[in-house]
Amino acid sequence: MNKILKGDEVIVLTGRDKKRRGVVLARVDADHVLVEGVNVVKKHQKANPMANNPGGIVEKTLPIHISNVALFNPATGKADRVGFKEEDGRKVRVFRSNGAAVGAKA
Protein backbone atom coordinates (compact mmCIF):
# COMPACT_ATOMS: atom_id res chain seq x y z
CA MET A 1 0.00 0.00 0.00
CA ASN A 2 1.26 3.47 -0.87
CA LYS A 3 1.63 6.23 1.70
CA ILE A 4 0.35 8.98 -0.62
CA LEU A 5 -2.64 8.30 -2.85
CA LYS A 6 -4.81 10.15 -5.37
CA GLY A 7 -7.13 12.61 -3.62
CA ASP A 8 -4.88 13.17 -0.57
CA GLU A 9 -4.16 16.72 0.56
CA VAL A 10 -0.41 17.25 0.66
CA ILE A 11 1.99 20.06 1.50
CA VAL A 12 5.20 20.72 -0.46
CA LEU A 13 8.36 20.48 1.66
CA THR A 14 11.04 21.79 -0.71
CA GLY A 15 11.47 23.79 -3.89
CA ARG A 16 9.94 26.98 -5.22
CA ASP A 17 6.44 25.89 -4.15
CA LYS A 18 7.50 25.21 -0.55
CA LYS A 19 4.65 25.33 2.02
CA ARG A 20 2.00 25.28 -0.71
CA ARG A 21 -0.90 22.86 -0.23
CA GLY A 22 -2.78 20.96 -2.90
CA VAL A 23 -4.65 17.78 -3.73
CA VAL A 24 -2.92 14.86 -5.45
CA LEU A 25 -4.42 14.57 -8.94
CA ALA A 26 -2.57 11.41 -9.98
CA ARG A 27 0.38 9.14 -9.30
CA VAL A 28 2.59 9.43 -12.39
CA ASP A 29 4.76 6.48 -11.43
CA ALA A 30 6.08 4.91 -8.23
CA ASP A 31 7.83 8.07 -7.05
CA HIS A 32 6.17 11.08 -8.74
CA VAL A 33 2.79 12.75 -8.16
CA LEU A 34 0.78 15.52 -9.84
CA VAL A 35 -0.39 18.07 -7.27
CA GLU A 36 -3.09 20.62 -8.08
CA GLY A 37 -1.64 24.14 -8.35
CA VAL A 38 1.94 23.05 -7.65
CA ASN A 39 4.87 22.97 -10.10
CA VAL A 40 2.87 24.75 -12.82
CA VAL A 41 4.93 25.91 -15.80
CA LYS A 42 4.11 27.86 -18.95
CA LYS A 43 4.76 25.99 -22.18
CA HIS A 44 4.90 27.73 -25.55
CA GLN A 45 2.76 25.52 -27.77
CA LYS A 46 3.08 25.71 -31.54
CA ALA A 47 -0.22 25.89 -33.44
CA ASN A 48 -1.33 22.67 -35.12
CA PRO A 49 -4.39 23.13 -37.36
CA MET A 50 -4.54 19.39 -38.15
CA ALA A 51 -5.16 18.60 -34.48
CA ASN A 52 -7.37 21.68 -34.01
CA ASN A 53 -4.83 23.18 -31.61
CA PRO A 54 -4.61 26.99 -31.75
CA GLY A 55 -1.27 27.15 -29.94
CA GLY A 56 -0.09 29.92 -27.64
CA ILE A 57 1.12 29.85 -24.05
CA VAL A 58 -0.31 26.90 -22.13
CA GLU A 59 -0.04 26.29 -18.38
CA LYS A 60 0.89 22.73 -17.53
CA THR A 61 1.27 20.91 -14.20
CA LEU A 62 4.46 18.88 -14.00
CA PRO A 63 5.08 15.94 -11.65
CA ILE A 64 6.86 16.46 -8.34
CA HIS A 65 8.93 13.82 -6.55
CA ILE A 66 7.06 12.09 -3.75
CA SER A 67 9.90 12.76 -1.30
CA ASN A 68 9.24 16.51 -1.66
CA VAL A 69 5.65 16.28 -0.40
CA ALA A 70 4.09 15.16 2.88
CA LEU A 71 0.52 14.44 3.87
CA PHE A 72 -1.29 17.40 5.45
CA ASN A 73 -2.78 16.61 8.85
CA PRO A 74 -5.93 18.74 9.36
CA ALA A 75 -5.93 18.09 13.13
CA THR A 76 -2.48 19.65 13.65
CA GLY A 77 -2.43 21.94 10.61
CA LYS A 78 1.05 20.69 9.69
CA ALA A 79 2.76 18.19 7.41
CA ASP A 80 2.85 14.70 8.86
CA ARG A 81 4.41 11.34 8.21
CA VAL A 82 2.29 8.27 7.49
CA GLY A 83 2.35 4.90 9.18
CA PHE A 84 0.26 1.76 8.88
CA LYS A 85 -1.92 0.01 11.43
CA GLU A 86 -3.99 -3.14 11.20
CA GLU A 87 -7.68 -2.64 12.04
CA ASP A 88 -10.25 -5.41 11.61
CA GLY A 89 -7.82 -7.38 9.44
CA ARG A 90 -7.28 -4.43 7.08
CA LYS A 91 -4.20 -2.28 6.64
CA VAL A 92 -5.06 1.37 7.40
CA ARG A 93 -2.96 4.51 6.91
CA VAL A 94 -2.52 6.59 10.07
CA PHE A 95 -0.82 9.88 10.92
CA ARG A 96 2.35 9.33 12.95
CA SER A 97 1.84 12.38 15.19
CA ASN A 98 -1.58 11.53 16.62
CA GLY A 99 -2.42 8.03 15.33
CA ALA A 100 -5.63 9.18 13.62
CA ALA A 101 -6.67 7.40 10.45
CA VAL A 102 -5.91 9.25 7.21
CA GLY A 103 -9.09 10.51 5.59
CA ALA A 104 -11.23 9.90 8.69
CA LYS A 105 -13.63 12.70 9.61
CA ALA A 106 -12.64 14.33 12.91
Swiss-Prot record:
Organism of origin is Bordetella avium (strain 197N)
Q: Which gene encodes it?
A: rplX
Q: What is this protein called?
A: Large ribosomal subunit protein uL24
- Say if the entry is tagged with keyword Metal-binding: no
Give the quaternary structure.
Part of the 50S ribosomal subunit.
Which CDD domains does this UniProt record tie to the protein?
A: KOW_RPL26
Which Gene3D superfamilies does the protein's record reference? Answer: 2.30.30.30
Q: Which domain of life is it from?
A: Bacteria
Task: Show the GO cellular component annotation of the record.
Answer: ribonucleoprotein complex; ribosome
Spell out the PROSITE patterns in the cross-references.
RIBOSOMAL_L24
> Which NCBIfam families would you find in this protein's record?
rplX_bact
GO MF terms listed in the record are:
rRNA binding; structural constituent of ribosome
Keywords for the protein's UniProt record, in alphabetical order: Ribonucleoprotein, Ribosomal protein, RNA-binding, rRNA-binding
What HAMAP family does the record point to?
Ribosomal_uL24_B (MF_01326_B)
Disulfide-bond pairs as recorded: none
Q: What does this protein do?
A: One of two assembly initiator proteins, it binds directly to the 5'-end of the 23S rRNA, where it nucleates assembly of the 50S subunit.
Q: Name one Pfam family in it.
A: ribosomal_L24
Q: Does the keyword Transcription regulation apply?
A: no
Q: Which GO terms of type biological process are on file?
A: translation
- Family in the record: Belongs to the universal ribosomal protein uL24 family.
